[in-house]
Amino acid sequence: MVMTNGKLILLRHGQSAWNASNQFTGWVDVDLTTIGEAEAKRGGELLVENNVLPDVVYTSLLRRAIRTANLALDAADRHWIPVVRDWRLNERHYGALQGLNKAETKDKYGDEQYMAWRRSYGTPPPELADDAEYSQAGDVRYKDLESVPRTECLKDVVERFIPYFEEEILPRVKKGENVLIAAHGNSLRALVKHLDNISDDDIAELNIPTGIPLVYEITPEGTVVNPGGTYLDPEAAAAGAAAVANQGGK
């Protein structure tokens, strides 16, 4: 039996309400904007145009990623395939920064501290109190967790997501399946860091645009054929990544 390579399709959710208002979102369950809905649909259309149709979808427990998956699948006429939702694909928890405006936070704490919280590998923001407005401490969807995070750095996301990827998702890709992961900027940065062996320092420079599929081809042995992945709309991806990099400006 000849084994074929599988495709791992990474799709960051479309623009959310707090992307549009330049706020730290983390685990706060905000919805997509109309622009974000259109981005998600376009992501699905790109899958069809490039003949990269998913067999299964993995997403987080946050509606912006779930709805992005649903809209993309509908546009690709793959609404019928299995969808697996797991908290380990959630966005990074931004701690006490959740809900704060990025530009105002940058002005208050300075560029160096702002970038350390936002882009360093091992520096988490201050913890969010359990009784704070944007805490998830009492959220029923996390009732089976031993404890809900109060803050996270990217290293924490790597430690919760990559073992799940290795155990649950990668084996399907190695069997030749096309697997769509509809998730978040930082959960996808954690995965790309792992796939491309990006250093702890260099990962600060990686930005994932919204709504544009990034495809990795993976052999049955688990080798990435195209390091760095292939965006299905490279021009839009470059512009989108630049916009993400500039968040925090006026």
Swiss-Prot record:
Keywords, comma-separated and alphabetical = Gluconeogenesis, Glycolysis, Isomerase
E.C. numbers = 5.4.2.11
Annotated positions for site Transition state stabilizer: 184
Record's catalysed reaction(s): (2R)-2-phosphoglycerate = (2R)-3-phosphoglycerate
UniProt pathway:
Carbohydrate degradation; glycolysis; pyruvate from D-glyceraldehyde 3-phosphate: step 3/5
CDD domains the UniProt entry points to: HP_PGM_like
User: Could you give a single Gene Ontology term from the biological process aspect?
Assistant: glycolytic process
For the protein in the UniProt heading, the enzyme class is: isomerase
> A Gene Ontology molecular-function term?
phosphoglycerate mutase activity
Q: Where is the active site?
A: 13, 91
Record-linked InterPro entries: His_Pase_superF_clade-1, His_PPase_superfam, PG/BPGM_mutase_AS, Phosphogly_mut1
Kindly list the positions annotated as binding substrate.
Answer: 12-19, 25-26, 64, 91-94, 102, 118-119, 185-186
Q: Which SMART domains match?
A: PGAM (SM00855)
Similarity field: Belongs to the phosphoglycerate mutase family. BPG-dependent PGAM subfamily.
Q: HAMAP family, per this entry?
A: PGAM_GpmA (MF_01039)
| Alphabetized PANTHER family for the sequence | PHOSPHOGLYCERATE MUTASE (PTHR11931)
What does the protein in this record do?
A: Catalyzes the interconversion of 2-phosphoglycerate and 3-phosphoglycerate.
Q: Give the protein's recorded name.
A: 2,3-bisphosphoglycerate-dependent phosphoglycerate mutase
- What organism is this sequence from? Corynebacterium efficiens (strain DSM 44549 / YS-314 / AJ 12310 / JCM 11189 / NBRC 100395)
